[in-house]
């Protein structure tokens, strides 16, 4: 990714300009999330940079200010900056804390990539879904309107999703192409992972309701 398109560099430059600091930083990236998976890797990177540099450079901006800066980089950035599980409204900037059970997840990426721009601009995408209220939300009844559109046009996603559902509750991430399956134990997730086809990227992760980055920064600031 060229620097002008890299959210890490963009986030650092925005913070520099906002705070008038002349300080800099070097970045080393260890890529773990699959490309084009719909897991918010770019947004998470941007949020991490804003939070870490705010501490490193001692610019001491409040979280709400960092979230506003992050919103200009992407709708998903604020939730990573706030660092807690949340019910999102608007374009993603209106957050209400929401703490589901911390399950284990098998995350799989079929051998394809999905264009987020194409999905959001598609005339086939459902746009009249009833609005959900945090007070009466049942997470089991929620759905991803993008999922039905993606599986209609991408057999790789459709086939993998159908296979995973036989083992555990499974859904697509965002606009895809990753699918996450929910398990009560890491052993259960790993057992199914061993059965996956060789061309499917996968990893097992534990759901967490609070960001470990926030905890680490609190320790540094003590």
Language model regions located:
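Conserved hydrophobic residues forming the short capping helix/wall of the S-adenosyl-L-methionine
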Residues: 12-16, 54, 168, 193-196
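DPxDG-like acidic metal-binding loop motif
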Residues: 8, 37-65
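Conserved active-site and cofactor/substrate-binding residues in soluble primary-metabolism enzymes
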Residues: 3-10, 44, 114, 155
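Short pre-catalytic strand/loop immediately N-terminal to key active-site residues, enriched for Gly-Thr
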Residues: 25-37, 170
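ATP-dependent small-molecule kinase catalytic core of the GHMP/sugar-kinase superfamily
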Residues: 59-169, 182-222
């Amino acid at each position: 990714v060229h620097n002008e398109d890299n959210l890490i560099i963009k986030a650092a430059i925005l913070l520099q300009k906002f705070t008038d600091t002349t300080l800099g930083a070097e970045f080393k990236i260890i890529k773990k999330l699959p490309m084009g998976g719909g897991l918010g890797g770019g947004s998470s990177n941007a949020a991490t940079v804003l939070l870490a540099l705010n501490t490193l450079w001692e610019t001491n901006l409040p979280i709400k200010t960092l979230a506003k800066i992050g919103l200009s980089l992407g709708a998903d950035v604020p939730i990573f900056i706030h660092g807690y599980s949340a019910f999102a409204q608007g374009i993603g900037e209106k957050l209400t804390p929401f703490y589901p059970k911390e399950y284990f997840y098998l995350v799989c990426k079929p051998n394809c990539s999905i264009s987020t721009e194409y999905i959001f601009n598609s005339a086939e995408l459902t746009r009249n879904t009833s609005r959900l209220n945090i007070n009466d939300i049942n997470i089991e009844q929620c759905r991803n309107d993008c999922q039905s559109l993606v599986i209609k046009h991408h057999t790789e996603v459709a086939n993998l999703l159908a296979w995973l559902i036989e083992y555990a509750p499974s859904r697509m991430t965002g606009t895809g192409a990753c699918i996450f399956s929910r398990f009560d134990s890491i052993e259960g997730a790993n057992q199914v992972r061993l059965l996956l086809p060789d061309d499917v990227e996968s990893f097992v992760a534990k759901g967490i309701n609070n960001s470990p980055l926030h905890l680490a920064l609190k320790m540094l600031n003590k």
